[in-house]
Amino acid sequence: GPDKGDLQSVKYDNDFGAWIMPFIMAAINTRVVRRSHALNDYVYGKDFRYDEAMSSGQGITGRIKGYAGLVALGALMLGKPDSLYRKLLSKVLPSPGEGPSAEERESGYFNFTVIGKFKNGKLITAKVTGDRDPGYGSTSKMLGESAACLALDGKKGTQKSGVLTPSTAMGDALLNRLEENAGLSFTILS
């Protein structure tokens, strides 16, 4: 579809009534969604667009938090592997292998809202939740269920070969596994 580039700044989002900022995973997630759409013969139409952002909140506080987050994200992205800047960053950031404690992983969670807009102005809203830390607990469960799905559930996706995405390789079989075994929920709100 006629997608624009990923969000590069802070802006106000009328649909959410809040300030939004770039989301670090958007650079990967958006490409996976768009490739899935293309592999499925543009099932949502050639005008389908997809992007992601992270809410930084409402009002002036949300705007300030958005710009602070943007600066922090930019600072992380600037650290080339062998640069002095990266060496300085490594003094304050977690080392490889470090991360949240077991208690933090177990008590972590995520939730996000997805808004779909149709040409006629109709909106559809969905909520996705996970019962563990998204960077560790939920991701490991998603990977495990993906492996089990590929090994045990046969060809459930819409595509059989090539460079596939999770949805085109595993389809609803993966969605069902994530809901049944990985602590995720996918709910249409309106």
What are the roles of these predicted feature ranges?
Residues 1-190:
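C-terminal catalytic/substrate-binding lobe primarily of soluble NAD(P)-dependent oxidoreductases
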